[in-house]
């Protein structure tokens, strides 16, 4: 996890936002990371590719998290995917009709979209920007109700 992420997750949880981990990899790897960083309580649910049987950008990854959170199709407009991989996270969210946010601070993957499907709705350059963005999006949704 990136520096500052644990604090962001803490802020989001305390503000009443529900957080899911939708990730490609092995369950054991994420268990180790959770324990190492004492993050077991920050995610309400996890949809990990080893368990789901597919990797992002497959919609099944996102649908699994939604089902575990008892969310329906109509709830997608309230869901935000924050990810560092254009091809998997952003494409997957965009295909599902979920608001996509690129974690532009990640050096792990390329940050320049090559097509419209890879273009995120928003980009954050530092984890500390995430709570304010989510609060802004939440207020926009409240105004649309």
What label would you give each PLM region?
Residues 2-3:
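Active-site core of PLP-dependent enzymes with the aminotransferase class I/II
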Residues 6, 10-13, 17-145:
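Asp-based, Mg2+/Mn2+-dependent phosphohydrolase catalytic module
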């Amino acid at each position: 996890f990136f520096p500052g992420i644990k604090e962001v997750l803490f802020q989001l949880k305390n503000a009443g936002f529900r957080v899911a981990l939708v990730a490609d990899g092995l369950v054991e790897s994420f268990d180790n990371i959770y324990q190492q960083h004492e993050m077991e309580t920050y995610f309400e649910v996890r949809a990990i590719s080893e368990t789901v049987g597919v990797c992002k950008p497959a919609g099944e990854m996102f649908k699994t998290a939604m089902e575990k959170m008892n969310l329906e199709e109509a709830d997608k407009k309230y869901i935000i995917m924050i990810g560092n991989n254009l091809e998997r996270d952003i494409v997957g969210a965009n295909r599902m009709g979920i608001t996509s946010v690129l974690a532009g601070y990640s050096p792990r993957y390329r940050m320049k979209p090559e097509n419209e499907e890879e273009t995120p709705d928003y980009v954050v350059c530092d984890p500390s920007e995430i709570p304010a963005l989510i609060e802004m999006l939440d207020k926009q949704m409240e105004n649309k109700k």
